[in-house]
Design a protein with these regions (language model features):
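Hydrophobic alpha-helical segments of secondary membrane carriers
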Residues: 53, 178-182
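A composition/secondary-structure signal for short, hydrophobic, low-basic-content segments
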Residues: 153, 160, 180, 229-230, ...
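Generic low-complexity, intrinsically disordered sequence content enriched
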Residues: 25, 69, 76, 176, ...
């Protein structure tokens, strides 16, 4: 179930989150060195910087990661299994980035440049993903997925190394796990925000795409085809508000010409999300 960002349910979640954060800080401060996350670690500039970078990159990269399989399934028409297989270039990119950064760091001992390179690459790739539309070819998606993975590979491990070199030996465990914590916090917030933006825009984007399709002869021909009755009924239900985009499974078997405005609406909305992520 989806709620508007200004709904009572959403505001209640905001308040609960803020209250929980305040209570967490209070109790962690009281526990001193026995705290799960000792607040004294934030006095170290490197640790504080990595914490901020972790939240920001976590939001961007995991928000982007959440969009790719959605794009492949909704716009590309792939099954969940095929969408997972089509993301293999992303995994290969992560492996490549991790291996390259790892080998260079082991030989030179220098690691600070890799998070910078990785962040730049992630930003550039997310920006290029704004070119995705309803007719984007898979080879372009695969290339950008690979580059996105390379960027991730340059960020994930070097940031851990940076923190480990900045803190005292007794804090290695908590500092290392904190990197993952900040990244996951960013991922949680980023994914929720990006999904909200996506479904907040998709209605207007789809409506605009339908209006542009009215004069398309192929669309009108498909609209009058008796074989497309079920698709037409589903489209009418969407336009009258009797159906929502919560369930898009019917798109896989629908006439591609008729649902092209929906695919275009989703693609345009996702492009906006990628731009925010960049």
């Amino acid at each position: 179930m989806l709620f508007r960002s200004t709904s009572v349910e959403s505001i209640a979640c905001y308040l609960i989150g803020i209250t929980s954060l305040i209570l967490f800080v209070i109790f962690e401060n009281k526990m001193k060195d026995e705290a799960i996350l000792p607040l004294r670690l934030f006095k170290d500039k490197t640790f504080s910087l990595i914490a901020v970078v972790g939240v920001i990159t976590g939001a961007g990269m995991f928000g982007g990661l959440a969009m790719l399989p959605l794009y492949l399934q909704i716009v590309g028409g792939s099954s969940p299994t095929n969408a997972g297989l089509e993301l293999l270039p992303l995994t290969l990119g992560i492996m490549t980035g991790s291996i390259i950064s790892g080998r260079v760091i082991s030989k030179t001992g220098k690691y600070k440049i890799f998070p910078v390179i990785g962040t730049i690459l992630l930003t550039a790739t997310l920006f290029l993903m704004t070119t995705f539309n309803a007719d984007t070819k898979y080879w372009w998606i695969a290339i950008l997925s690979y580059l996105f993975g390379v960027g991730l590979g340059h960020v994930l491990q070097p940031t851990v190394i940076a923190v480990q070199n900045a803190v005292a030996k007794r804090d290695l465990g908590v500092a290392t796990s904190s990197v993952t914590l900040f990244r996951q916090l960013g991922a949680t917030v980023g994914t929720a925000a990006f999904i909200s933006v996506l479904f907040g825009r998709v209605g207007n984007e789809t409506q605009a795409a339908f209006q542009n399709s009215v004069t398309n002869p192929e669309y009108q021909k498909a609209l009058m085809d008796p074989n497309n009755v079920s698709t037409v009924q589903q489209l009418q239900a969407l336009q009258t508000g009797q159906a929502t985009f919560d369930d898009t499974s019917w798109l896989a078997s629908a006439n591609r010409t008729l649902i092209h405005p929906i695919l275009e609406g989703f693609a345009n909305s996702m492009s906006h999300v990628f731009l925010i992520g960049a």
